[in-house]
Amino acid sequence: METSSIVQKPALDEDTLRLARQVFQCVREGDLASLQPLFDHGFPPNLRNESGDSLLMLASYHGHHDLVRALLRAGADPEVANDRSQTPLAGAAYKGYVEVVRALLDGGAQVDGHGEDGRTALMVAAMFNRVDVMELLADRGADLRHRDASGTSGREAAQRMGAEDAANWLRERS
């Protein structure tokens, strides 16, 4: 008798799916009061949606620094990238959320961590002219000369995006 090595994930029932949708909506809205009891009772902090976005990614992307801190305390992994190879730190850098970036770094995010594309949070911040985020990342030890998987530097990426302040900032420091 031959057994298959393929293991299928069990289908989730409608109640479980409804709860997951509600949790993701609470995260987008920053509703920590509704979420904290779930985290206190062991709700999985690394839950991901169909796009690969973790709860931490969505909280970071929407600028909810208190929720980011709560998720990190509950055990969320700050290095989990989504299906587009973006880390929560890169998402917060893209949006320019300095306090979220600070919370992620305080919670263990690697300052030069990156997804498969090799882009660090500093590179993303540079591309979108988020100089205040770049300053925080540099203060925390970010590599100003890092190159992504295609060999592009943060300064080159900033120049291509027309982010002159960021490109000048990097030129002055590297």
Regions found by a protein language model. Name each.
Residues 34, 66-67, 99-100, 132-133, ...:
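Conserved ankyrin/ankyrin-like repeat signature
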Residues 1-41, 50-53:
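Intrinsically disordered, low-complexity regulatory segments in ankyrin-centric signaling systems
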